[in-house]
Amino acid sequence: MNIDQIQAILPHRYPFLLVDRVVEVAPGEKIKAYKNVTANEEFFNGHFPGNPVMPGVLIVEAMAQAVAILAMKSNGEVDMAGKVIYLAGVDNARFRKPVRPGDRLDIEGTVVKRKGPLWKLHAVATVDGEKVAEAELMATLAKK
């Protein structure tokens, strides 16, 4: 999925759209996506001057946006009019290595379980094949 297709699903826009491309999506199962982290990211101005590091909460947000795409695609195109996926919870978030300008943040998300409008998902973020973060995410489907 290119950026136009992503924007047709997610309500986020610059500077808060944190998924640049979806490489693979298997509805009801998994997603692979990425964010190109550039030196032009606004958050690097203050986090941290002279030692730029992507904030962990934004890594979690990037993972949440990727799994939101997975949930939306899993629910079916017809059912999505007027609906959005909201982040409902984050558990067991772990950050292993810093993400810096020039990195490509690869995200893999999998469905753990679904009950009605509530989704439990697992997401892992890597850079150059090394795990930088992971979390269990809860999401809920709701009206806009």
Please tell me what each predicted stretch does.
Residues 1-13, 80-81:
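Short aromatic-glycine motifs in intrinsically disordered, low-complexity regions
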Residues 18-21, 89, 94, 106-110, ...:
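Residues located in well-ordered beta-strands
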Residues 22, 63, 109, 129:
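A residue-level signal for conserved active-site and pocket-lining positions in enzyme catalytic cores
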Residues 47, 51-79:
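Helix-adjacent hinge/juxtasegments
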Residues 67-106, 132, 140:
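Hydrophobic beta-strand-centered segment that forms part of the acyl-chain substrate-binding groove
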